[in-house]
């Protein structure tokens, strides 16, 4: 008989079992006997049977729970991420299963209520980068027209607090129309904002009273406390992961990869988080985040 998922229960049910149907807390009976699944409870209020996995990432999954947890640990402990192929090899999963499993874990890491970054006395750097394959490696019919330095790549715009959190966004184009709503909703008005001399970032930075920029085009990278080194360091980690670990990330899935990299950065060792802490905290995100295979657009190539 499979063991009862006691550790998962302790993490998700700190105050006792929670009925997913009526919400009653700590008013359930653990069903005993060989005819019942391990960890099966019955709510004393509505009489609904349930386990700790109902309403979570793991609900109705044929993958054993210990493999879900092992895959999560592998992804949380690797600074540049781990490909689905590698996860599958290590855990004995098929290519399709490991690909979908990894995307479900990434989905659980996405922030549901982002809130504000920065604030009074806080410094935030913001900039854009571009990720994706080289145009010369694509079939002629799929190449995009030349124009900017990001031709054929996907645009990522990010905000990073000095010694704090990062939040990155996949945007269709780096312009004020796409970015202004993001800043309005996620960047506190009293924040000290540092950017480079790029037209879009500089223009948006002017919306904040305490804004300064450095001009990379003339070799100016640091001027006192004014620089964008923090966000460039994050972009370096992101690109090494995208290019070196995953090799190819499709447009429709990029937001989930960004969620993964953001999460690891926000729960990094420099902020006092160990691999075990990062893993444990990630478990809290599995509730209410069931990603179906159809929602991943049933991509044909499961390369990452």
Residue map of PLM features:
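Residue-level recognition of single "structural anchor" positions
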Residues: 1-304
């Amino acid at each position: 008989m499979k063991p009862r998922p006691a550790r998962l229960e302790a993490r998700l049910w700190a105050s006792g079992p929670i009925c997913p149907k009526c919400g009653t807390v700590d008013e359930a009976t653990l069903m005993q006997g060989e005819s019942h699944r391990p960890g099966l409870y019955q709510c004393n209020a509505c009489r609904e049977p349930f386990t700790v996995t109902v309403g979570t990432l793991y609900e109705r999954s044929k993958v054993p729970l210990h493999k879900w947890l092992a895959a999560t640990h592998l992804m949380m402990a690797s600074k540049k991420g781990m490909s689905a192929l590698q996860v599958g090899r290590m855990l004995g999963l098929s290519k399709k299963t490991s690909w979908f499993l990894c995307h479900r874990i990434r989905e659980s890491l996405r922030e549901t209520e982002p809130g504000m970054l920065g604030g009074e006395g806080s410094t935030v750097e913001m900039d854009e980068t571009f990720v994706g394959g080289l145009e010369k490696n694509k079939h002629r019919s799929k190449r995009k027209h030349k124009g900017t330095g990001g031709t054929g790549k996907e645009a990522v715009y990010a905000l990073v607090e000095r010694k704090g959190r990062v939040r990155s966004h996949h945007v269709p184009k780096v312009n004020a129309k796409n970015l202004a709503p993001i800043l309005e909703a996620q960047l506190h008005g009293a924040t000290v904002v540092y950017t480079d001399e790029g037209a879009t970032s500089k223009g948006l930075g002017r919306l904040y009273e305490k804004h300064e920029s450095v001009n990379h085009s003339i070799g100016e990278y640091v001027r006192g406390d004014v620089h964008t080194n923090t966000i460039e360091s994050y972009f370096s980690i992101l690109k090494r992961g995208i290019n070196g670990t995953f090799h190819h990330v499709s447009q429709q899935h990029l937001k989930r990869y960004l969620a993964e990299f953001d999460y690891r950065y926000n729960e990094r060792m420099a902020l006092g988080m160990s691999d075990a802490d990062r893993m444990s905290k990630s478990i809290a995100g599995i509730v209410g985040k069931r990603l179906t295979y159809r929602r991943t657009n049933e991509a044909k190539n499961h390369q990452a």
